[in-house]
A protein has these predicted regions:
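Residue-level detector of intrinsically disordered terminal segments
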Residues: 1, 69-71
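Short, charge-rich amphipathic interface segments used for partner binding and complex assembly
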Residues: 28-69
Length: 72
């Protein structure tokens, strides 16, 4: 189970990814942002948050829309 702080991190990452996508940022810029988020929290968070962040990364790689419902 994710803590409230971890949910905030995930929600903020998803919002930023969707914003970058709306602004037509390059896929590799978005991937760099997600990778930096993963690096920042990697040693200090639950496995569930890491799994969700890697799922976000995978959706960016595949070019799919990142859904807000992922956090549930």
């Amino acid at each position: 189970m994710m803590t409230s702080a971890e949910r905030v991190v995930l929600r903020a990452t998803i919002r930023r990814v969707n914003h970058y996508r709306e602004q037509k940022f390059d896929k590799y810029v978005i991937l760099e942002y997600v990778d930096s988020s993963i690096r920042k929290v990697r040693n200090h968070c639950s496995d569930e948050l890491l799994r969700c962040l890697f799922d976000v990364r995978q959706q960016v790689v595949l070019g799919k829309e990142v859904q807000e419902e992922m956090e549930k």
